[in-house]
């Protein structure tokens, strides 16, 4: 039998507070049961809300999972803006590396790479990566605008290179990610995407 008082409390949860409670509960369920074993009923119980309200807002479990994982990723791996492309990339890579080695980070990576038969899951995965890639690409675009990076640099390729390194460690190597990886990877990448700028400055000084 439903507790009237508890039902009243659930009914009062609305808007941003409702979303925050549900997403926190989703993350907790992922941590406890694994990303493949989370359903609306589990999250509703954990959040203390009506399961129907979850369906009305997110429609499917994959969309709820993506919302929760993307929100947590944005909080744990923000896009830095220090005024230096080298510093921004190194901070981004460092935070990404740390996050990838947490239970939620590992769950996120595995959720977005393991194949599934559900078209909805595939759409949600693509949506997640498009949002994250677009956000991270701003680091390179700002570097271009400041003249730190060659204007012909493929921003997405840079981000994919950094992210790909981290993902390989988590999904294939199964070993701790070296603490030196962010610095080494960023230095290697920047040696290529800043070479034209460096040469142009050298030519200007000689001229």
Curated annotation (Swiss-Prot):
Recorded superkingdom: Bacteria
Plastid in keyword set: no
Alphabetic keyword roster: DNA-binding, Plasmid, Transcription, Transcription regulation
DNA-binding region ranges: 39-58
Cross-referenced InterPro entries: Homeodomain-like_sf, HTH-type_TetR-like_transc_reg, HTH_TetR, Tet_transcr_reg_TetR-rel_C_sf, TetR_C
Entry's induction text: Up-regulated by PQS.
Domain annotation HTH tetR-type: ranges: 16-76
SUPFAM superfamilies, alphabetized: Homeodomain-like (SSF46689), Tetracyclin repressor-like, C-terminal domain (SSF48498)
Pfam families attached to this UniProt entry: TetR_C_11 (PF16859), TetR_N (PF00440)
GO molecular function, one term: transcription cis-regulatory region binding
Signal peptide: none
Functional description taken from the UniProt entry: May regulate the expression of genes involved in the degradation of the Pseudomonas aeruginosa quorum sensing signal molecules HHQ (2-heptyl-4-quinolone) and PQS (2-heptyl-3-hydroxy-4-quinolone).
Protein name, UniProt field: HTH-type transcriptional regulator AqdR
Naturally occurring in which organism (per UniProt): Rhodococcus erythropolis
Record gene name: aqdR
């Amino acid at each position: 039998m439903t507790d009237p008082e508890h039902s009243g409390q659930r009914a009062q949860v609305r808007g941003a507070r409702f979303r925050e409670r549900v997403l926190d509960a989703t993350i907790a369920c992922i941590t406890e049961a694994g990303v493949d074993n989370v359903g609306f009923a589990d999250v509703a119980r954990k959040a203390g809300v009506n399961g129907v309200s979850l369906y009305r807002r997110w429609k499917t479990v994959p969309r709820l999972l993506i919302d929760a994982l993307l929100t947590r990723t944005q909080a744990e791996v923000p896009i830095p803006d220090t005024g230096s492309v080298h510093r921004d990339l190194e901070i981004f890579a460092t935070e990404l590396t740390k996050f990838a080695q947490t239970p939620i980070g590992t769950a996120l990576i595995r959720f977005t790479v393991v194949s599934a038969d559900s078209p909805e899951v595939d759409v949600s995965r693509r949506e997640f990566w498009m949002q994250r890639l677009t956000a991270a690409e701003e680091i390179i675009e700002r570097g271009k605008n400041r003249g730190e990076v060659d204007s012909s640099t493929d921003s997405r390729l840079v981000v994919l290179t950094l992210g790909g390194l981290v993902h390989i460690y988590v999904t294939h190597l199964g070993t701790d990610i070296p603490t030196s990886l962010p610095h080494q990877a960023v230095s290697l990448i920047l040696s290529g995407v800043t070479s034209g700028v460096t040469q142009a400055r050298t030519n200007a000084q000689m001229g």
